[in-house]
Amino acid sequence: MLCIKNGTLHTAVSKEPVLADILIDAGKIVEIAPQINGSFEKVIDASGLDVWPGFVEAHCHIGLDGYGSGNAGADYNETNDPVTPQLRAIDGINAMDPCLNMAAKAGITCFATGPGSTNALGGTFTAIKPNGKRVDNMIV
């Protein structure tokens, strides 16, 4: 288990940040409390540091915009028809898009990514996490 100690937590339930510890087991938060005691595999001292929850990007085109590969990898704005409901983000996501790693480092833990907004009806979005090298392992 991992324990993050003495962090200044910014949460969705309190207007003001709170000083607290966070206990994590198998990648999941299992407890948040003012003080957690015990024996842990790893302890991170977050004294003087701000701790934020993971952010969710509700509308983006990450993995679809061809960043780093140019127009050949741009799979989000189909301009050949104003109505393209058959387009599916899952079919065009580039799991190796460097933007995924950049966004994860910035604290974004989940994305709703999909076809562009050029069309009146542009297709289906997909929710993904920025980890993994294969799209089927990234799907939420």
Model regions: which residues?
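Structural beta-strand/beta-sheet cores of well-ordered domains, especially the beta-sheet scaffolds
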Residues: K5, A20, A89, T124-T126
